[in-house]
């Protein structure tokens, strides 16, 4: 009788132990905390199971992470995200939409992501610092709190966008591969683009820029500088220009066949109102 009771007890204990081990294994499995689709794109992180300080693994199951694409206000719950283990990372996108004002994320570090080419960040209102890897080709920053950027090592950078933030200065002198520079609603008063001979398109909107020298940018196709303090634009050395947009009253020096649009104060006001609605 005792032997039978002992056997039953052993079986029960074994079952309980298996359940406990299975539960622990399930909780600690990356597949249970991270979702990677068939395109090797990380699209979901279970913050409840991970906690607010995220460490992204190199792979989940047999899927190596090449893209991080987090687009939802849900991700505003992330306080920090460590991607240093993701050695094959090529694209990083973080879009918080309406949750951006609640975000506590202050820093992103991509120094160990040697294959990373594209960084896009939007509505991370607390974000103060980004450290890039030298191979980055595209940087798009919208609605951040970044005041300073160090892009000196980004020799391959060809597209730079910064919208809606307190950026006060930008040094692009080492980024000679740039063909697009778009800056809107920032605090930049001066910018030097003399060394950017490959530059094709520039946008400066809503910045206190007082002058813009494009005399050394022969490949420019589009210049849009309005809602600024620029009063004179010399296009004498820009034979490829097709589009020019400036504030009403801006003096354009030099002959050009480009299509010219003059923005009035009323135009700017309507544009600002439309932006608020969106």
Would you name each region that the model predicts?
Residues 10-12, 19-20, 146, 188, ...:
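Short hydrophobic transmembrane-like helices used for membrane targeting/insertion
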Residues 23, 115, 161-166, 182:
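Compositionally biased, intrinsically disordered low-complexity segments enriched
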Residues 75-79, 102-106, 125-128, 145-147, ...:
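Canonical position 11/12 of the leucine-rich repeat
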Residues 2-98, 103-118, 123-125, 132-137, ...:
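N-terminal capping/linker segments that flank leucine-rich repeat
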Residues 68-70, 81, 92-95, 108, ...:
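Conserved hydrophobic beta-strand positions in leucine-rich repeat
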């Amino acid at each position: 009788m005792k032997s039978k009771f002992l056997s039953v007890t052993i079986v029960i204990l074994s079952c309980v132990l298996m359940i406990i081990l299975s539960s622990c294994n399930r909780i600690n499995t990356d597949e249970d905390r991270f979702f990677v689709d068939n395109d090797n794109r990380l699209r979901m992180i279970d913050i409840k199971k991970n906690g607010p300080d995220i460490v992204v693994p190199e792979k989940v199951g047999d899927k190596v992470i090449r893209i991080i694409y987090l687009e939802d206000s849900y991700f505003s719950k992330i306080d920090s995200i460590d991607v240093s283990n993701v050695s094959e990372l090529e694209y990083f996108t973080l879009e918080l939409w309406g949750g951006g004002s609640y975000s506590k994320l202050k820093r992103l570090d991509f120094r160990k992501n040697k294959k990373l080419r594209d960084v896009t960040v939007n509505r991370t209102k607390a974000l103060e610092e980004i450290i890039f890897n030298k191979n980055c080709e595209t940087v798009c920053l919208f609605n951040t709190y970044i005041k300073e950027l160090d892009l000196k090592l980004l020799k391959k950078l060809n597209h730079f966008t910064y919208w809606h933030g307190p950026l006060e200065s930008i040094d692009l002198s080492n980024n000679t591969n740039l063909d697009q520079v778009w800056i809107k609603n920032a605090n930049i008063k001066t910018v030097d683009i003399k060394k950017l001979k490959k530059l094709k398109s520039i946008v400066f909107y809503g910045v206190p820029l007082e002058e813009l020298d494009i005399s050394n940018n022969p490949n420019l196709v589009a210049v849009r500088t309005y809602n600024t303090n620029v009063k004179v634009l010399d296009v004498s050395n820009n034979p490829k220009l097709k589009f020019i947009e400036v504030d009403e009253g801006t003096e354009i020096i030099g002959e050009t066949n480009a299509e010219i649009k003059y923005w009035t104060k009323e135009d700017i006001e309507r544009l600002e109102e439309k932006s608020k609605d969106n």
